[in-house]
């Protein structure tokens, strides 16, 4: 609205940051924070792709953590203000940090609020991670998925 564009992608990143004081007056702080997430996440995705192409999984994990932290802080999509006593996503993310101890990484995934946690867990602690999460959130709360060696591809 502030820039007269239909979508944020049409706004220059530097122009956005320069105009934050005025944008805050027009759109409020939450809109500013969400836009900041979008601008930084757009760059971060490119870095994630590069890290995977270079087979640098440690860098990829750092970027996933940064992305998840940004979702939590700037998108504010981990809990609902309508029921602050229920913050399952935040609890799950905090527990993931405790369980993984830097060996893996987790982040909010999907739409948040009633979304899911995406966790990259080393094979040798998958069972421990799953048990701990299900001890807290209930049976079948944690689903173990595997990524194929070849990733996504078109099937004819």
Whereabouts are the PLM-identified features?
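C-terminal nucleotide
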Residues: 1-107, 119-156
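N-terminal pre-core extensions flanking Radical SAM catalytic domains
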Residues: 114-117
């Amino acid at each position: 609205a502030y820039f007269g564009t239909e979508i944020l992608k049409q706004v220059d990143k530097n122009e956005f940051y320069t105009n934050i004081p005025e944008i805050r007056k027009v759109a409020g702080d939450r809109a500013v924070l969400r836009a900041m997430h979008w601008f930084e996440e757009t760059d971060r995705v490119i870095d994630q792709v590069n890290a995977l192409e270079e087979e640098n999984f440690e860098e990829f994990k750092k970027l996933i953590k940064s992305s998840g932290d940004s979702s939590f802080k700037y998108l504010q999509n981990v809990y609902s203000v309508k029921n602050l006593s229920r913050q399952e996503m935040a609890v799950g993310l905090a527990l993931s940090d405790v369980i993984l101890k830097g060996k893996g990484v987790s982040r909010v995934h999907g739409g948040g609020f009633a979304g899911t946690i995406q966790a990259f867990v080393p094979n040798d602690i998958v069972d421990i991670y799953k048990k701990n999460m299900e001890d807290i959130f209930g049976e079948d709360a944690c689903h173990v998925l595997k990524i194929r060696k070849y990733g996504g591809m078109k099937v004819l």
